Amino acid sequence: MRSSASATATRPTVVQFFITCLLDHLYPDIAEACVTVLERAGVRVEVPPGQTCCGQPAFNGGFLAEARQMARHFLAVFAETTGPIVTPSGSCASMVVHHYPGLFAGEPAHQARAEAVARRIREFGQFLVEDLELRYVGGRPGRYTYHPGCHLSRELGVRGCAETLLAGIPGAELRPLPEAEACCGFGGLFAVKLPTVSAAMMQRKLENIAASGAETCVVCDASCMTHLNGGLVRQGRAPMVRHLAEILAEVGP
């Protein structure tokens, strides 16, 4: 870990916020929670106007020309900014980091721009722990368990950040999640193409969440949250899956 003096000198003070489609259209409260937490940590949050979808749904569906068009727009918006690009979605972050450069193979100028932007992408929890070196930034006591999203943990290789922040909440108990590494069954278009398999995976994940004894299951992707809470509601149960930012934005007992 860096010394406190060097950490203070190098820690980012301004970030660009990549809001994602789900938060922009369905969960603006989670976006607001992200801003609350970042500002509490002493970071100014800028939201570049004109940002749209990163193109992941089109890419996953095989519509590469359409995905490339959306990626060009994304790069045009964010390449003109400076500083880290923070996003509350490991899935969308992974799209930019791992798939944008390949989308522009044969287009050196766009590929170079994609690689430059990709180097600036930071997932929300990752930024708090790895860049700001925080261990506590907010949250209330409770029994939590954590479901690591596939793209965040496997493609980005980000592990332990959310757990660190949850464990740092005074009075919080972090319960282990059985089969934590197993997918929740969403997988974007996977849930549409193979709904029966997706539903079975979701049910197993819900059973494991219940077995953890936690009051709240925390995720870092709104897509996982939507999928799991949708399953709970269809079973007549109360939603209990929440985004990490929502948890950290709360302060006090």
Task: Indicate residue ranges for each PLM-predicted region.
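Iron-sulfur cluster-binding electron-transfer modules in prokaryotic oxidoreductases
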Residues: 1-253
